[in-house]
Amino acid sequence: MVDKLLNATLNVVKNRGEQLFIDVARPYAYTLVAKFDRDKYIMRVATDAEQVSQSAIKDLKLLSIHTNAPSICVVSSVKGHLLQRGVVYLRDDVVFMSLATLTDVLEGKKPIFKLNRGVITASIDGEKLRAKRQQAGLSLGTLATNLGVTRETVYRYERGEIEAPLKIAEKLINMFGEDITKKIKINETPKVSQEELASRQIGAKTYRLLESHPDAIKWEDRTILISSNAERYQKTVELANALGAEVERA
């Protein structure tokens, strides 16, 4: 199935952007690097999100923050359950989405729903919700009754303290419009914690890569991919060219 998804993804890249790098010889942390308009993306294609290991996630994050290229994982399912169109799955700040959702994103339609621990939710723009509720002449209690939630829940939506589950979010969208929700940004590099950096650090601003063509990545006044494997060296050079980095032999 991954071959079918990969071919479909490559068709989207061909029709909507430019393929800068690809290697499907084995499952690396990434499958390809693509460019859509001015933005480059490091992309992994897998049937299920569980096929992308935690070490691959760390590699993606390190590559992203050092090359300023966001990471996107294109998958069909999460833990065996179909990932719906318009819903993204966030794992350690790396975005997973279906190919249909990616197509929507490329057409300018940003996703608003996210999957977390089996529950689909949306982030509500609290200020807009409060303004539109007041414009409609609705009290907190009345809106809560219409939504089937407590007054306290609506109050917390307006303060941005909690996200709304799918059905409640859909009710709010029907009442006040889609701009009541916050769009999920997919063109930003994932956040990397100091603990994650420390777990991979092998030198000054140098970090080990475990599921990539280069063995490490470092930052001086530029991004450098470090290669000690002769068999992977050529692909490391191709990856560096795609991401605007340089290569250094270990």
Curated annotation (Swiss-Prot):
Q: Which GO terms describe its molecular function?
A: DNA binding; DNA-binding transcription factor activity
Q: What superkingdom heads the lineage?
A: Archaea
List each copy of the HTH cro/C1-type domain by range.
129-183
Q: Specify whether DNA-binding is a keyword of the entry.
A: yes
- DNA-binding region, as residue ranges, is located at 140-159
Q: Which residues form a coiled coil?
A: none
Q: What keywords tag this UniProt record?
A: DNA-binding, Transcription, Transcription regulation
Q: Which SUPFAM superfamilies match?
A: lambda repressor-like DNA-binding domains (SSF47413)
Protein name (database record): Putative HTH-type transcriptional regulatory protein PAE1627
Species of origin reads Pyrobaculum aerophilum (strain ATCC 51768 / DSM 7523 / JCM 9630 / CIP 104966 / NBRC 100827 / IM2)
Q: Upper taxonomic classification of the species?
A: Archaea, Thermoproteota, Thermoprotei, Thermoproteales, Thermoproteaceae
